[in-house]
Structures are given as C-alpha cells and as structure tokens.
Amino acid sequence: MVAIENKEVLFGGSLKSTEEYDQFFCPSIDIPKFLFKYWDSKPLGKNVSSDQFAETAIQMLEYFIQNNYTGPYLPIKPEIWLPQRLRDEATLKDAIIKSLTVEGERPYRLAPKLLFLLLSQTLFNYANSKDPLHIWYKARLDFLHQQMLKEHVSELFNQIMEGMHIVSSHVSSLDRDLQGRFTMEMGLIQSYYGRDTLALQLMKESAKVMDFHFELTGALGRRTKFQTFDTSQLVVLAKSRDRCKDTEQNKSTSTQPITFELNDDTLLEKISFKEDQKSLAPSEELDPILSSEDPNHPSKLDPLDASLLLAFCHIIKNNNPDDGLTREEMAPYAERVLVYPVNWSVYTMALLVRARLEGFKSRTVERSVLQMQALLDQLNDQLSFGKSPEGVDKPENDEGLGSFLPKPQDGENSASLKERLNYFYNLLMPSRWQLEAELAERFISVGATKSALEIFERLQMWDCVVMCHCSLNRQDLAVQVIKRELENDPYDFLLRTLLGDIENNPKHYVEAWELSCKRFAPAQRSLGKYYYKKGDLLQAMNCFNESLKINPLSYPTWFTYGCAALELQKYDAAMEAFSRCLSINPEDGESWNNLASAMLKAKDHTKEQAWHAMQQGIKYMYDNWRIWENYMLISVDVNKWSEVIRALRRIIEIKGKDEGERAVDVQCLDLVVNYVMQSCDNDASGLARMLNELLKMVVPLITNDVRLWRIVARYYLWRRHFAESLNATLKAYRILISSPNVTSDEATWNKTVEGALELVEAYANLGEMPGRMGGVVAKDWKFKSRSVLRSLIGKGKNIWENTESYQKLESELENLK
C-alpha cells in the first residue's frame, strides 16, 4: 500500500469554492473538522482505502520528523495543499496551534511545518485503520506530540497506551528485532512518564528478545597519560547476536557527525584497559558470552542494540540523583556505543549523551561545549529554514545560531534519510529548538543566565525568558515580558499563570482557567498552591481536584492534594491521592510513608496494612531517619520487634555521628529490652542477638543520659553478665554525681541519691557474683559502697541534711558498717 500522491486533491487545495465549509472557517478555523467533512462529502473519501489514508499519515509524520529532528531539510510547503483561504500564515499558524493544543498544553509555536504533524494526526483519526502497523505509528505520533508539550497530558497518555496495548497482542508474530524494537519503545514511553521500574523491566525484556548480551562491570585500566598503575574502571561489555542478514545497518558508516578529540594534557582519549583478561570481573560473575569481549577492542554492535544501551543510560539518569556517581555509571554506556559509528542517528545521540555528561568536569567541559555546538550546527545547517524561498516557518527574528566552528562543505557528513529515520523512534532525540534550549539550561546551571536569556529570547520561549529574569531578581522585567506577549496572544495560558506566580495574584489563575475553557490544569494547580500556602486547605483541595480531573498524571498535584487531605483529616481522600502518586512512581518513599500515616487513622484499615506500606517506604528512602522513626513506632504497635531493632540501628547509623545519644529513642529501646527479657529464654535467640548488636552501637554514644546506662545494666543482668551490669550502673551514677546542680537543686539531689542507692544495691547483689576473669565481681563491694555514700553525704552536708533523702543516705551507710 502506498501513500496518496495528489496532496492538493487530498487536502482540498484544488477546491474552487469553499462556501459549503464556512462553518469550519468562521469564526475560527478548524482544519481537522474541515478535512473530515471534505473527505466525507467527496468521492475521494469513498474511493481511497483507510490503509491509504494511514500510509499518507505515516508519510506526513516522517516529513515532520525530517524537518524538525533529523534533516535533511525538506523544501515542501504543505500549506499550498490546503484551500486558498487557509493559506494566510498568521491565521493558519494560530489554527494549527489550537488544533494541537491538548488539555491547555500548547506545542512550541515556532516549530517548523507543524502542519505536517496536524495533517498526520487528522489522517490517522480519519483512517481509523485496524492494521497493527498503522496503530503502532499512530502511537508514535501521539508520543512525539506529547514530547512537544510542556507537561504530561492524560489524553495522549491514554491514546498511546491503548494503541501500544493493541499492537502488543500482535508482536509475537513479528521477527525478534521488531519485537525488541516495540518493547524498547514501550520502555521509553514508560520512562518518559516516570514509570522507570516498569521501563527497566521492558528494556531487559527487549535485550532478551533480541538476544543482546551486555553488562556493566569493572576492569583494570588507566585513565590518565602519566598513570603508572592500573585501577578499577567501569566498562560496559556488550555483544550483539549474529544477524543472518548482513545488511547496510550492520556496517560502519562514514557519514558520522563531527566528533571532537579530547586533546587534554592529562586525560587519555579513552580509558586504556589492561590487556590481560584477568583484569575483568571474576568469570563466574560474568555472562559467559561476554567473557571473550576485549574492552580495548570490543565487537561491533547492531544499531538497534546500541539504541538499547542509550535507553538504559536514560533510565539510569531518571532512577538516580543528578550527581557525579550517576554520571560515572552512565558514561560507559555512551562510550560503548561510540566505539563504532554504526548509524548516523544512534551515533549523534551517543555524542549528545557524552556531551551532557562531560559538561560537569573541568577537563572535559571544553569538548562538551564544542560537541554540543557541532551537533547544533549540524541540525541548524540541515534544517535551515532559509534554503527554500517557499519556507514560511522562518520566524522574523531567526538569525540562526552563532557558531565558532567552520561550516561543513555541502554533503559533508550527510547521511541518507533512511539512515536518519531508521532508529529515530528508539532514541529520545531532541529537536533543534529543544537542543538549543538544553544548551541554554546548561548556561543557567553554570551561572551564565544572561547568555541563556539571549537564547531563549531568540527561540521566543517566553516562559523561560520570564524564569531567567526572575532568577536575576528582575521580576519587573519578567512582568513586562508577560504583559507584552499577552497583548499579542491573550490565550497564552502558561504566561498568564506565571504572572499569577510573580504577582501572587489568584485572579490570573482564574483568567487562565476560564480562557482555556477550563482545560488548562496548571492554572487550577497553581490556584490550589496559592490557597494551600494561605492555609485554606479545603479550597486548595477543590482546586487540586479540578486540576486532576483534566490531568490525572500530575504527581505533584496528587501529592499536595494528599497532604491537604491529611491535614483536614480526610483520610480516604489522602489514601486515594498517595495511591495515585504510587501508581505514577511506585518508588516514592514519601508517598508510601504518607499512605501509611493515612491508613493508621482511617477506619477501614489496620495498623498491619499501614506497617506494610511503611515497609515499602523505607526501601526507597533508606537514608531518611524520619521515615525510619515512623516505621519504628508502627512496628512497636504491631509487635514487629525485630523490625523495631532494625529501625533503631538504622536511625543510629544515620544520626549517631552528629547527634550521639540523642539518636537513640530511649522509650523504644526500653520496650525492646523488656520484650526480649520477657519472651526469650536465653541470650542465644535470634532477637536477643540482634538486640546485643544494637546495644554495641548504643554504648559508645552514651554521654549524659542516665536512662540508657540503666537499660544497658538491666539487659546485662538478664544475660548474667554481672560485671558489665555493675559497670553500667556505676556509669549512670557518675553522670548524676557530676551534675553542677547537685548542691543547688533539690530535684537533682534526689535523683542523685536515688542513683547512689541503686549503685549500692547493685554492689550488694552483684559484688559476690562470678567475675569475668575468675574470682568475684567486686570483692571489696562494701568498701566501695561506703565510699559512694560518704562522698555524696559530704556533698550534701549543710545543704540537704534536713531532707528525707539525706537521712536515707545516712541510714544506708549505717547498715554497711
């Protein structure tokens, strides 16, 4: 099946009169409805099959990708296919933007030839083809549409998932590479929407289907020119299966993008690994298929397998903090892909990933900037709007990108269209404007905000311009920009919402909501935040609810909605909110924690259910002591004493170094010790051993808390460690007697007397017990007891001698004579 060739007939450009379609042109233009009516009323719609419409839709989609992402420039002016009355540039652009706006979210206005995207979408919708391949391409279109919007929108997400679900039932009949390609695309979609756990599973499944073996491991090697010894380095070992068909895709390509050498006086161009195979990880831990891989001379990868490595790189970034360790883990994946230039698009993406990673190091930042500039120039040259006099998408202020690199000669480093598009859907490739905006964001991260501002102004990304002005504390300029642009386009809902943020005025949120016909979810979300900060939680929940009706994929909205519900004691609403948060991101420990808190107070849920929810939370917030503290308290309530001990240990590990004994929850520790002493027959039980290890961590932290020494003394006494028990009691007394308030505060004096009498009692009970090194614990226990009492009596004489506690000391001393 081939695409329809006569586009003027297809899209109504040959119409001499459009009076019968006036309803679609006034008061505003609705291109999709016009085309639907046109196709229904003309023989064309009846004589052309739905498959031909779908094939034409695929053609339009690839035209759009070619003009915005991959190049080379396509000198086709799609608006000439439309009726004459639709060809006014400004009016047509507004109509296209309006048709591509979803849930109030607009695509980038200056994206060249957006009409291709709209025509593709309209053709797919009209065709309604049942062919799995066409449904797959429709899902690809929807995902590309989503990537052009600022926020995730549920309408497109649902369409994508529905289409991919239909295709998944037919995938098993395809060859293994197509199965792997489909699974990889599904993984990228899930990762884009923040579902990285599922995405990771899909990527592993894709590798398994394609019989692609790879592993991140360690090998001995050298990173610098003057290094005299080998150290452990991360490396990705990967091997593609032998494909039967030796097609062009498996051969190296000479049409690779410009690649820059590092040219550093210290760092090697790439890591030099030790030639000895023993430098790799132990063979029993390594996939046998990879054991023959040489890190210095790896085998050539299939482009599809290389795409999968880059997809894994993307998931690692999403799953980990944005820090040096994460970048070190990502780098070997990109380096493995860059060994051989097997495909232009794959190689371009690998260079971009490496440039992103190298922008954070002083020795590699120069190559990072040069490489990113080269990739920008490559797109700028190949997507140049000025090549054809018929290009109508060139903005008036588009002066092109400034470059300090020489321009390539015509045809230099130019790949075929087929090579560029072949793996596009398996790579999250940025468009020209997205790449330039990314460069501007890099400038912001290093403090060059003014340079970023210039780029955003040239791209007419006014929301980013506003944010730059605000970061420079020039809110006045930000407001000027917003008001100027709103005069040109009153329906820019995002700018109107930003104006509300800057002026802290809710009327702008309301205006954005009303102008969007109550479809722009961020307006209600911002209004909800406004009321939340003011403390009007009920009104905030109402606003969040309106926002979530439009966009239920917004994790921040669900989370804040849940927090407001918790504060208002609406526990069912809170549970729903945090459950939705977890459906979006199952690894969000804070949502698990809040869900458990709501379950604890809800009528229809047990503490056991809350405990299980909290148990999930600590998996993902392992270093958060507050989460562990909550888990500890719930574990006490449900009598999970081993988990109480585990939580106490973890809290001490996190806080002990900075807070010392304050990191220990004395009450929980006391409860655990009591439980172990009552329920365990001896100190050989598992729980007793766990408690013993815990107390080994507690004892070095104790400085001034008498309660802790008393707990330790009681536990050692139960274990029949008499000397240790007596020593703990003595240390508790020393803390009391060292207080400067013993002679001035009667309460302190009474506590000290109590401690002294406890110590004397311990001497009497334990002094004659067997000691650690033979003999008894304290042979002279009476002498030591008298010394303790005399010392304390001497301190209290003339101050507390008329008190009852003082009389107790004298009486006890008399008994010891």
From Swiss-Prot:
UniProt feature coiled coil, ranges: none
Gene Ontology cellular-component terms listed: cytosol; nucleus
Gene3D superfamilies: Tetratricopeptide repeat domain
Keywords annotated in UniProt: Repeat, TPR repeat
Pfam families registered for this protein in UniProt: TPR_8
InterPro entries for this protein: TPR-like_helical_dom_sf (IPR011990), TPR_rpt (IPR019734), TTC27/Emw1 (IPR044244)
Domain of life from the UniProt record: Eukaryota
Segments annotated as TPR repeats: 459-492, 521-554, 555-588, 625-658
Region (Disordered): 276-298, 386-413
The protein's name: TPR repeat-containing protein C19B12.01
Taxonomic source organism: Schizosaccharomyces pombe (strain 972 / ATCC 24843) (Fission yeast)
